[in-house]
């Protein structure tokens, strides 16, 4: 894998300044102006990039009341379904090209975590400069392969992965001629107990 990767006009390497990514996620609360304000706050705080997530409720889960699709882990969303949660959490696709333009005018790199093959196609039309692979997608090899084929840098989280999963994902990228991969150490618990982080 390459030791030096360009994301926009930012060089990512061991001796480069830290590349700071602000995650918007669902914090816009389905309000476009709030999304823009979040990007401005990120820029004002010194972020280099803003990251969103690209999915719809129907591309990420099933509209189903089955117990497997109910939220019951003692959160503020208990009693709702995943589909209903994602209806209030996703970033509308019609916003995304507009948000990208505004972010770039602010001097931010704008990119996303796709969650299915159609969202990769959509982000390619938007010409995002880099992709973020969420921990829960690292073992979806057709998905990894499609992202790798774009030739763009890939930031890949490893939260639920075994070493074999990480090796397979990296090998898949390499097979597609893409060695611009950055691995992130991730603890897939929200919030993560400090004892799970293994940080010294």
Predicted regions and their residues:
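Catalytic domains of carbohydrate-active enzymes, especially glycoside hydrolases
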Residues: 37-53
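Conserved small/polar residues in nucleotide/adenosyl-binding loops
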Residues: 197-200
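N-terminal amphipathic alpha-helix/helix-capping segment at the start of soluble metabolic enzymes
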Residues: 1-21
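Glycine-rich, proline-tolerant flexible connector loops at the mouths of alpha/beta enzymes
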Residues: 49-88
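Active-site beta->alpha loop and helix N-cap motifs at the rims of alpha/beta catalytic domains
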Residues: 76-135
């Amino acid at each position: 894998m390459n030791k030096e990767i360009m994301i926009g006009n930012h060089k990512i390497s061991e001796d480069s300044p830290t590349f700071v990514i602000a995650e918007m996620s669902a914090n816009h609360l389905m309000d476009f102006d709030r999304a823009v304000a979040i990007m401005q706050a990120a820029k004002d705080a010194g972020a280099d990039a803003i990251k969103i997530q690209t999915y719809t409720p129907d591309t990420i889960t099933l509209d189903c009341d089955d117990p497997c699709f109910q939220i019951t882990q003692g959160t503020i969303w208990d009693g709702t379904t995943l589909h209903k949660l994602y209806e209030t959490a996703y970033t509308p696709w019609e916003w995304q090209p507009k948000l990208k333009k505004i972010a770039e005018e602010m001097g931010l790199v704008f990119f996303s975590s796709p969650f299915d093959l159609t969202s990769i196609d959509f982000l390619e039309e938007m010409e995002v400069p880099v992709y973020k692979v969420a921990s829960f997608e690292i073992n979806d090899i057709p998905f990894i392969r499609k992202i790798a084929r774009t030739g763009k840098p890939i930031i890949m989280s490893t939260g639920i992965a075994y070493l074999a999963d990480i090796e397979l994902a990296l090998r898949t990228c390499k097979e597609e001629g893409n060695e611009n991969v950055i691995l992130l150490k991730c603890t897939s618990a929200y919030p993560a107990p400090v004892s799970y982080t293994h940080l010294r």
